[in-house]
Amino acid sequence: MNADTTFAVVDLETTGTSVKDGDRMIQFGCALVRHGKIIQTISQMINPDRSVPQTIQRLTGISPERLVAAPYFDEVAPALHQVLTKTVFVAHNVNFDYPFLNAEFERIGLPKLQLEAIDTVELAQVLLPEISSFRLSDLTTHFAIQHDNPHQADSDATSTAKLLLQLKARFQALPTPTQQALIQRHDGFIRETGDYLKMIASPPRPLKKEFVQVGPLVLRRPTTTPTDLATAGAYPATELAKKHLLQPRYRFRKAQAKMMDAIFTHAQKTEIPLFIEAGTGLGKTLGYLLPYAYLATPEQKLVVATST
């Protein structure tokens, strides 16, 4: 594949999952993508010459009445085969659509397609690790892609084509080291999905200021807003004040609050050492850091040394 390749983004609606078991196609949808644009769409109803399970009718909204006048697959297969030849096959779960379509071609005596193939499910899993669902309907919602008729092949194919373009842009926006790390693992992707990433990779560019590279990883630089607690108000001496400052994640512990108050009071009034015995789980780190944060200033710095 190269920059001039035509990508055939295909979706099939079928009576089931196995051509060998007698399942057949009821709708073929395809969106042809070239140079980053959808250049043609194809929608074809197909008479399966068998009953369509009620579950499939409910899922797709395609009734047997709509299929009665549709052509049989062997009537449209030569034209579909010609359209797909010399393209790169793309599907959302390519290991279903591509083998099923090839099995249908073989069934009527046409040669199997020998195409490179890309899986948009895997692309989404790699490029959108933060989302919880990789169903086409959820991904189109994530990218605000209009998807009028889920589980109808023409709508699914067009939506998958738009998803492919969104995922391409997502990959090309990644920092160069991240792109290169994914490309190095291209052999582990489904079919030629990894080769597609290699083909669309952006030219090397320096990291933006908000990123830092740590070994093979590129991380966003931590951004913090320093807070001068000494000028942020009075030390929270009461239980209510401590809860107001630290909630919602803070769980008030009476012994910890007592430790805070003792350290704050001691630091202001005496140079006599203060010894505190505190059990495991009391929250000693916050117990001494909070009062010291109210005592430290740019002019009067504090150093805390600890072995834990």
Predicted feature locations:
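Conserved non-catalytic scaffold segment of RNase H-like nuclease domains
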Residues: 1-117, 129-151
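Acidic two-metal-ion nuclease catalytic site recognized across multiple nuclease folds
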Residues: 2, 166-238
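Acidic, divalent-metal-coordinating active-site segment for phosphoryl/phosphodiester hydrolysis
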Residues: 152-167
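Walker A/P-loop
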Residues: 268-291, 302
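Post-Walker A helix-loop "phosphate-sensing" segment adjacent to the P-loop in P-loop NTPases
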Residues: 294-300
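Conserved Walker A/P-loop ATP-binding site and its immediately adjacent core
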Residues: 300-308
